[in-house]
Amino acid sequence: MLGTDIGIDLGTASILVYIKGKGVVLKEPSVVAFDRDTNKIKAIGEEARLMIGRTPGNIVAVRPLRQGVISDYSVTEKMLRHFIQKALGKRTFKKPRISVCVPSGVTEVEKKAVEDATLQAGAREVAIIEEPIAAAIGAGIDITRPCGNMIVDIGGGTTDIAVISLGGTVVSTSVKIAGDDFDEAIVRYMRKKHNLLIGESTAEEIKIKIGSAYKRPEVITLDVRGRNLVTGLPKTVTVTSDETEEALKETTSQIIEAVHSVLEQTPPELSADIADRGIVLTGGGCLLQGLEELIEEKTGINTMTAEDPMTAVAIGTGKFIEFLSEGPSDN
């Protein structure tokens, strides 16, 4: 039996697995819960995510990836093994070939750590692809043409920005500001403005339900529960979408600055292509309400979100391994 080709979007917040011929078959949080006393893993993925902030002292839920790179090698390897087996089921007899994406700014050492962890987790061969290239492929862009395309991939831990032409990256940057930082900015704002302590899952709920990077046509509100920092007692506060814009302003500004930086380094001919074709957004972070409008306003360039931004990187990573297995076409 032939081995299966798999593409893995190894994200700080989520892991997505793409299988050739089936598409994205698995999407789970990059979280592992283990018992500190015995060092045994108790849960991986969604089950572990539900334990964050709700576990007894001996059970800790950790994210083994930080800002797009491995921060805990052995936990990452076990997590990868679990997800690969879960995605494949028990139907495979041969180790799969796997392509994994990494942020564009990683070092060779960080890249090697991802490759080694994937091999240890059960891969036959490993191909590494940079996230912006994977995102562009997954967004349906023909990256082989001599034409400039700009991708802004906002994940959980990093934002990767790149200008791509002829199958390669011409200019790129990777900034450690992304979806997780949106959540942290909301936590800080609630603490400072409302004396309310909230957890990361509550911050994420605020971001998803009323979060905004750009003023909404009409203000919406959400009742938020947390702990009053003055009394130490539970408290409910009503938060508005305008407040989230204020909370997120510093973080979104850093992403805009990085976009400007890449545009300033782009050769003139490719700049003209980008002005014509626009900027394409991918990654879960780009789903923040108003971010598309904010980038468009600050750059003056038409900005659009990919059809399925959450899965673009996983699809592109999977199609990359398909391309490698088939080899280049005659043309």
What are these language model-derived features?
Residues M1-I154, A162-V280, C286-N331:
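Nucleotide/phosphate-binding catalytic cleft detector across ATP-hydrolyzing
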